[in-house]
Amino acid sequence: MKYIAPNWLPGGNLQTIWPAVVSVRALAQTPEAAYQRVRWDTPDHDFIDVDYAYAAPSTPALNQKTPQKRPLLALFHGLEGSSASHYALAFAQVAKQYGWDYAVPHFRGCSGEINRAPRAYHSGDYEEIGWMLGKLQDYHVAEGGGPLLAVGISLGGNALMRWAQEAGETAAHTVAALASVCSPLDLTASGHAIGQGFNRLVYTRMFLNSMKPKAMARLKLNPGLFDPQKLLASRDLYEFDNIFTAPVHGFKNTEDYWLRASAKPHMHRIKLPALALNAINDPFIPARSLPQTSQVSRHVTLWHTAHGGHVGYPQGRFPAHVQAMPEAVTAWLAGQLS
């Protein structure tokens, strides 16, 4: 991806915050923001909400490699994200331009309603990802659709890569190609980075302000799930994960969770076309922690851009747009279809 940041929006933090705060306002007014919601029942008597944006049957494909049967692009959102996140709305626009159907399965607790089960979601949630992809494939094929493609944003991208690693040769039976965008593939490095300095003051506080109330609501439905005083006193993601995310999802502690959930150590196991896009100036992800060519399989393409921030990639004159990244990623995915 060839990306040049606007001169008026320098630095990783501005390139992260501006799209999330300003660009999303314009995107929320677009027709693509009018999703159709479907609720799936899960095997553990819970639910997953999926927001669909269907392409018009007459929409021509932009890429000659796109098959006549409409592909489905599935997006797995980031930490505390949703189908209303700026990147989800931007991908919805691009999918429509390609004549593809589009779906955003929500991780538990992120669709606007607290789930019933004790579990929430986490960065290594590959079993949940696999179940969602299977449901998407079954539904899309039953409707006469074409291949399934997947993109994961930040946390969702790490979980998607972990699914591909665990699925091995069988992954290609479900997904034609996948991409991760600004994903913390080394969770230990990223977890420590987001807990320091400006990151701690701004991003960590923002995440915890959303995650703590959800955890407390889950506690009301599942008494004894965790110590509420300790959770409310948590000051960063390390402490929150140690009290809630790790023990609730079967990990010993934060260190065990971050180590076992990280996709980077297993990227040599990926057996289908996969793209990993990261910005060198991402404030969440230290550049030194990004995977290198020698650490991934021949099926993995690495794009490391100098700028872009964390899932930002603003472009153009004030007030900028955020189509550059979704357009580049979608074009790469389309290029993997035969």
For each feature predicted by the language model, list its residue ranges.
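N-terminal cap/lid segment of alpha/beta-hydrolase-fold proteins
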Residues: 14-65, 314-316, 320
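Short, surface-exposed "cap/lid" segments of acyl-processing enzymes
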Residues: 55-116, 135
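Catalytic nucleophile-loop/oxyanion-hole region of alpha/beta-hydrolase
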Residues: 94, 108-149
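Alpha/beta-hydrolase-fold enzymes
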Residues: 138-140, 149-248
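Active-site nucleophile elbow and catalytic-triad environment of alpha/beta-hydrolase enzymes
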Residues: 243-266
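Short beta-strand/loop motif that positions the catalytic acidic residue
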Residues: 270, 276-278
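Conserved loop-alpha-helix segment in the C-terminal half of the alpha/beta-hydrolase fold
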Residues: 280-301
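Catalytic active-site module of serine/aspartate enzymes centered on a nucleophile-bearing elbow/loop
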Residues: 306-338
